[in-house]
């Protein structure tokens, strides 16, 4: 896997988007907490809606323990290393940082938002998305074809793609059907574009956000051949 390691030469430096990572202090949350978390964040910083590329990631603990995949209904413990990560237009970063020190209530737990750090995107060949909004009735092939058509608008041509696990997410009083997705063998320009734009809807609720495919939790999300 190639990976840009020299930040001075990274094409991500020229991007108008970046990651804003906040430390958090929270004991635990349910796996399915995207709607509640994002709703609280949007109440604090409604201006995050001003750029449709902006996104809010869900918080994640370990996806498996001793080889056993935890059920989606189980609460996840959050360590001191847990981060609240957003992808933000660089022009908005100072405004979004205003949530430092704020405290919100989620599922009876207190979540305190700490200091933030700004990071450029990590440019890698393979990207992974935990939750892509999908129609439950369509096949995996039709789903991938739909994704391919959307990404062509951003000059991203899919060479290799793999659907992973499907799951539903609670969204207010409704449920949303999602699939996980890995896209491989991207060019540097395509990798950056995918991380800037995402795919599909509800990016402010943890969906459609592409992450570097480098961690064990990403591997655990995919079905064996």
Language model features with spans:
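RNA-interacting cores
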Residues: 1-225
């Amino acid at each position: 896997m190639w990976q840009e390691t020299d930040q001075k030469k990274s094409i991500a430096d020229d991007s108008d988007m970046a990651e804003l990572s906040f430390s958090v202090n929270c004991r635990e949350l349910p796996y399915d907490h995207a709607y509640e978390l994002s709703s609280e964040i949007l109440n604090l910083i409604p201006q995050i809606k001003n750029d449709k590329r902006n996104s809010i990631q869900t918080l994640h603990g370990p996806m498996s323990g001793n080889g056993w995949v935890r059920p989606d209904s189980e609460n996840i413990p959050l360590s001191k290393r847990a981060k609240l990560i957003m992808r933000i237009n660089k022009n908005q970063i100072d405004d979004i940082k205003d949530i430092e020190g704020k405290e919100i209530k989620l599922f009876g737990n207190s979540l305190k938002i700490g200091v933030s750090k700004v990071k450029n995107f990590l440019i890698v060949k393979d990207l992974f998305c935990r939750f892509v909004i999908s129609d439950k009735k369509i096949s995996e092939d039709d789903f991938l074809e739909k994704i391919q058509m959307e990404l062509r608008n951003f000059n991203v041509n899919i060479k290799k793609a793999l659907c992973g696990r499907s799951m539903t997410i609670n969204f207010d009083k409704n449920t949303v059907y999602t699939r996980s997705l890995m896209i491989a063998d991207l060019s540097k320009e395509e990798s950056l574009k995918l991380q800037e734009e995402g795919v599909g809807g509800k990016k402010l609720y943890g969906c459609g956000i592409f992450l570097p495919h480098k961690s064990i939790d990403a591997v655990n999300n995919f079905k064996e051949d």
